[in-house]
UniProtKB/Swiss-Prot annotation:
Name listed for the protein in its UniProt record: Protein MGF 110-5L
InterPro entries registered for this protein in UniProt: ASFV_fam_110
Residues annotated as signal peptide: 1-28
Role played: Plays a role in virus cell tropism, and may be required for efficient virus replication in macrophages.
Amino acid sequence: MLVIILGVIGLLANQVLGLPTQAGGHLRSTDNPPQEELGYWCTYMESCKFCWECAHGICKNKVNESMPLIIENSYLTSCEVSRWYNQCTYSEGNGHYHVMDCSDPVPHNRPHRLLMKIYEKEDL
C-alpha cells in the first residue's frame, strides 16, 4: 500500500515540476525500443539492428524509405538505447557509446556508413 501511495506521489510531483514520467521521459536500456520511437532512434544511429528488417540476407530500413536495400553485414550493430531526462545514449555493445542531448541530437551515422554494402541485383 505504501509503495502505491509513494508511486502516485512521485507521478504527481513529476507533473507539477514538469519532469517527464517513466513512460514518457525515461527509457531503460533496451535493444528493442518502442515502435513509436523508432523514427527518433533510427535517425541518429541508423546502423542499429532494430532499425532494419532483414530476410535472406537483404535488409530494408524500417523508418527511412529512401535508404537503399543493404546486404546484412557488419554495418548492422547490436545497439542498446536509453534515455534519462534529456540524455539519450546509444551503446554499441563493444564499449563504444554515443551520448547526446535528446532535444539537440547529433547523428552518429558516418563511421558506420563506411561499412555499408548496398544490395545490387547482381549480388544474388
